[in-house]
């Protein structure tokens, strides 16, 4: 309880900052422009092909924002060309995008000011201790061998976009900033559609990456806050009073509604939630909740999560979005892999004096395989091959130079090998390399209007070297005098490269153009 109250006090301190006046400062938009150009993932600035920053247009925007009818016209006529009171498409896009990027920069300031310094790092509660993506797969190798059941969770989505604004109310009490956020959401979703509208969802994500990430992280952190807090501090649920939770907006009202639906819920001792060997891992919109407990315990957790998220957080959680699996009998899709924990049987002959007998030993092994079907489907959608995996040429790249074409195909191949280097079976990767290599050859042959055989003979070993991976280059240096060398021996080697910062685009077909 003291940890929760301490966290609530920190949240209080974050509410003292009013950031709306910063939107009238020109340097905020210049900073947003520099972030878009120099960030880890460069994006097209303001949705236009022109990446130049115009301080004159920014000054005009700030002057228009001071006008009394600026926001009135924008809100009353969101679907017309009068958005931001300007009919020119260029100014329309520029103003909306620059406001979105600037707002995303400004709204992050209260949260960053509330973060503890290095000297206060020891005071951070344990349930806020998050780990980097670099540690996910080593963690799975170490822990999953000792666990029994797994819940594969698709993180629920809010029923209405207004919930995204309400989630920020207890962190930011700057009312004008919240109204501005409603304006952006109203513009991209017409304010009447659900967040499940994939068209408006991806449009908002594409054109407002920084703002989208901020909203999504705030939304997920709210969901995980209750999940992890109740997991590690579940003894507090034995209390009948809800006074401790009053720092949450509308929490008491939701508790009364929940009390009507489930009378006596908080009076029961939920001792069955206390499982010291439960582990939580999340990446993007998926999460894993693994435990050593029984199947009954996992079913109770599933029921609890569904009811809790719906009645307390207004998150639309369908029961089928939480799938229960036994680790030894199934595999699950996570981070572009198909991990599983199969049981391998090993017969050992034991000799004792004149008697010998066999011992049946069962051993668990964390196994990660490459999803062949999804990767081939992604290559097919990207027009590198047919649906059955037959390589084809890529006509849209024939206007590039030969070396640019070779570099693009080779980079995709090396990235696939690099990302899936921890797979226990890599034969599918060599099949993907064959598809990309032949697709590259056919693209070059189509460009020069020749046959694949003729083009391959002209390039020779230079063509093959572009598709060499790191481990193959090491083998080539060790065996430079060997004319024939097979890399099949490296299929079983597993190396987790720790420079993976995001999932490969080919793993998620939705990211392909």
Swiss-Prot record:
Keywords: Chloroplast, mRNA processing, Plastid, RNA-binding, tRNA processing. One of its GO terms (cellular component) is chloroplast. InterPro entries: Domain_X, Maturase_MatK, Maturase_MatK_N. Its main location: plastid. One of its GO terms (molecular function) is RNA binding. It comes from the Eukaryota. It is found in: Plastid, Chloroplast. One of its GO terms (biological process) is RNA splicing. Belongs to the intron maturase 2 family. MatK subfamily. PANTHER family: MATURASE K (PTHR34811:SF1). Usually encoded in the trnK tRNA gene intron. Probably assists in splicing its own and other chloroplast group II introns. This is Maturase K. It comes from Panicum capillare (Witchgrass). The gene is matK.
